[in-house]
């Protein structure tokens, strides 16, 4: 099955890698959709986010053995992209539910499934940035 996930992936950390490996293990290929720089700014993560530009974030993700395809999206959510590629499995981190995940209803309606992968490590890019800044 084709697996799809998305995120900002600004400063890749162990939690991201474990999550992506778990997502890939659910199927035969993993597509990772990455928020464009403008999309990240719309999310309200801070005026200086993303720390790493889109091309850098995509290159780092593409270098992971568990990732088969990396694509970017400009919208606030990847709903249109999810509907266009219609994966069999849509994956998000453990704090998401099908009700709060863009595109989940469409995937499920088409016979696919939504999977929330539990967080394996207590990691956060936002917390890491705050720590580096001494906050």
Locations of the language-model features?
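Nucleotidyltransferase catalytic core that binds NTPs
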Residues: 1-135
């Amino acid at each position: 099955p084709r697996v799809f996930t998305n995120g900002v992936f600004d400063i890749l950390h162990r939690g991201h890698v474990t999550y992506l490996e778990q997502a890939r293990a659910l199927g035969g290929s993993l597509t990772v959709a990455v928020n464009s720089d403008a999309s990240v700014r719309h999310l309200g993560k801070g005026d200086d986010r993303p720390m790493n530009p889109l091309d850098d974030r995509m290159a780092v993700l593409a270098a992971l053995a568990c990732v088969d395809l990396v694509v970017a999206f400009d919208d606030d959510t990847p709903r249109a992209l999810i509907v266009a590629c219609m994966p069999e499995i849509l994956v998000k981190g453990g704090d998401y539910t099908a009700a709060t995940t863009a595109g989940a209803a469409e995937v499920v309606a088409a016979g696919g499934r939504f999977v929330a992968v539990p967080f394996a490590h207590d990691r956060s890019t936002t917390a890491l940035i705050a720590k580096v800044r001494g906050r």
